[in-house]
Every structure is written in C-alpha cells, then in structure tokens.
Swiss-Prot record:
GO MF annotations, alphabetized: GTP binding; GTPase activity
Protein function: Essential cell division protein that forms a contractile ring structure (Z ring) at the future cell division site. The regulation of the ring assembly controls the timing and the location of cell division. One of the functions of the FtsZ ring is to recruit other cell division proteins to the septum to produce a new cell wall between the dividing cells. Binds GTP and shows GTPase activity.
UniProt name for this protein: Cell division protein FtsZ
Organism: Francisella tularensis subsp. holarctica (strain LVS)
Signal peptide: none
Length: 381
C-alpha cells in the first residue's frame, strides 16, 4: 500500500561544511556542481583558506596553531575546533541539515570534524558526515588515525557515509594520475552530498522532502548512498541495480537496514510499472520492516534514460570484504522470487504538485525497527 500525503513546498536550509584540507577541497569542488545549499570551508591553515574559492570560510585555532596547519596531528585539530566552538555554532545557526565532509587521517579534518558534528547535534540539526579514508600509499599510520577519527565522528552524527580511497585505484587503474585520483575522490563526496540534498531541494511529481530524509537518517549510523543511470527497455531495473552496487563506497551489509530513500528521475515517458520495478529491486535486498520512501522527479531532458538515487541507512559493516564478481543474472532471479513471496516493506510515497522551489519539511515519526533475515547483498561485476 502507498501512503499519499499532500504537502506544501517550503525551504529547508542545508549547509555543507568542509573541515581541513581534504574537506575544503571537496567543498570547493561541490560548490560548482551543487545548488540550493550553503558551503563553508573550515581550517586551521590560513594559507589554504586564502586560496579557497568557497564563499564562506572560517579559520579555527589561531591562538593554538598561529595560522598554520595541524601538522597531521588530530589532537591539534580537535583542540583548534574546541577553541572556536562558539564560532562554529554561529556558522551552523539556522540550518535544518548539515553535511560534514573531510579527508580522514590528517590533523584538522580528523580531529575537527567530530567537534563540528557534536556542536551540530547539540543544536538539534540533522547531521550527516561524508568522509574519505586514505589511499594505501599514504601509509598505515594515516590509516590508523583515519579509523580512530571515523569512530569518534560516528558518535556525533546521525548518519555517516565512508568512502575508501583505495576503491578508486581499482576503478581508475594504476595508470591514473595522482590528480585524477584525488579528483575522483572529490567527485564521490560531491555525488553523495548532491544525491541527498537534491532529494530535498528539487521538487518532484512524487516528492521526497526534508521530513522524509530526517525520518530515514536520524540516529541511523552507517549509511550508503548510490546513484545509477541506464537507458533502454530495462532501464529501471538496471539503474536500480547500479545504484545499490556502489563500488566506490564502503563494503556494507544490507541485512537489517532500517531505512531507504529512493529518488527516481526520468522523462515524461516514465511508467508506473518502472516505478514499481525499481521498488522490487530495492525491497528484495532489505528487511520487511525497513521504512522505504520513494519519490520521482520528471526531467524533460531525460528522453530515454532513468537515474535512481538510493540512500540506505542503519546498516552494518561487513566483517570480511566481499568481491564484486557475483553473477548478476542468478541474483535477479532469486530476488524476483523472493519479492513475490514476501510482504512488501512500507513504501511511503509523497505526492505533490510540481512547482519551482524547495521541498516541504513537515514532521514525521518513524519507529525503531527490528532486523530480520533477508537475501544477501549482492554486488555487480
């Protein structure tokens, strides 16, 4: 069954804060690609901030570092952010949702990002972190610092999406330049922020608004964001599969996932059958008890293609890494059979009039849900 909820359209204020050098670079990259959100770069390094093209900048810990960086010391980054908690609070004032992005493993981002998150949560803001883990060539010491920083950050956010840079090497190949590798990392961070923020800010025929995002991301822990695009006769299924594959994001286990937001973008030719087909793919990999919220956006420029954005929250890390070489055909047959024999997860649909402007943010409540056995999460080749 679908729940139909009429809603008015209003603004939800979204702020994206890049902490440290990696976070600042990512935000600078994003501000050229993502609209309808406010961007901020926060750093101890005054020289790095002076070169930033981000409109809003904040230098922290000037009494501590004298305008220099944190020297790859997370403790310095933490103390610098703590020194300027009041300024950070002022920066976050008025936000409904905050994305915190950082390259973990260094000093300012690793130590400062958890402080920013803590302040945001204390202010009652929906707080989501999107961070990278170091490349293997950056060494075990940096990786250890990153892991410790991520553990600390996780304590203070509603949801966290982690991007291991090592995955980029397998996708890009060893012949890729260093610049290409870091640009690719920025692309992944940007797509994660864009994928979630556009769910809120871009009006749709069937609308996903801030209240939906809040219900699925509040106090949910580990999250995954995936985007897939396909064209042709099987575009709905193929785009949905690509979205949940997410080869660049952290290996995760969808068993017991508590919430899913699905956004489907296509042209005027999108059918209700395609809408349901995307739902089949998504529901076949999650618990019957998970909250599934779906929305659509009609883009007249997409004549033959379809894009599916999926945000999955309340998931668990995989103890051992899974390969991507799973045969997809057999998994689809199993999924189709499984789906036809079980009750669909709650599939909540928001219907709104298509207008320009941001989406509505009425309050909705979501109950805690229990984990249950479901088909294993299968990766595409």
């Amino acid at each position: 069954m679908f729940d139909f909820n009429d809603s008015m359209v209003s603004n939800a204020i979204i702020k994206v804060v890049g902490v440290g050098g990696g976070g600042g670079n990512a935000v600078q990259h994003m501000c050229e690609e993502v609209s309808d959100v406010e961007f901020f770069a926060l750093n101890t390094d005054g020289q790095a901030l002076s070169k930033s093209k981000v409109q809003n900048i904040l230098q922290i810990g000037t009494n501590l570092t004298k305008g220099l960086g944190a020297g790859a010391n997370p403790e310095i980054g933490k103390r610098a952010a703590t020194e300027d908690r009041a300024k950070i609070e002022q920066l976050l004032e008025g936000a409904d949702m905050v994305f915190i992005t950082a390259g973990m493993g260094g000093g300012t981002g690793t130590g400062g990002a958890p402080v920013v998150a803590e302040v945001a949560k204390e202010m009652g803001i929906l707080t989501v972190a999107v961070v990278t883990k170091p490349f293997p060539f950056e060494g075990p010491r940096r990786m250890k610092a990153a892991e410790q920083g991520i553990d600390e950050l996780t304590k203070h956010v509603d949801s966290i999406i982690t991007v291991p840079n090592e995955k980029l090497l397998s996708v890009l190949g060893k012949g890729a330049s260093l610049i290409d590798a870091f640009n690719a990392a920025n692309d992944v961070l940007g797509n994660a922020v864009k994928g979630v923020s556009e769910l809120i800010t871009k009006p749709g025929l069937i609308n996903v608004d801030f209240a939906d995002v809040r219900a699925v991301m509040t106090n949910m822990g580990l999250a995954m964001m995936g985007m897939g695009e396909a064209s042709g006769e099987n575009r709905a299924r193929e785009a949905a599969e690509a979205a949940i594959s997410s080869p660049l994001l952290e290996d995760i286990n969808l068993d017991g996932a508590k919430g899913v937001i699905v956004n489907i973008t296509a042209g005027m030719d999108m059918s209700i059958g395609e809408f349901e087909e995307v739902g089949e793919v998504i529901r076949s990999f999650i618990s019957d008890e998970a909250i599934v919220i779906a929305g659509t956006v009609i883009d007249p420029d997409m004549s033959d293609s379809m894009k599916v954005t999926v945000v999955v929250t309340g998931i668990e890390k995989v103890a051992m890494k899974r390969g991507f070489g799973v045969e997809k055909t057999s998994s689809l047959q199993q999924s189709a059979s499984s789906f036809s024999n079980k009750t669909s997860a709650p599939f909540l649909r928001k219907e709104t009039e298509v207008v320009t402007g941001a989406s509505n943010a009425p309050k909705t409540d979501s109950d805690d849900v229990n984990k249950s056995d479901i088909p294993s999460f299968l990766r595409r080749r």
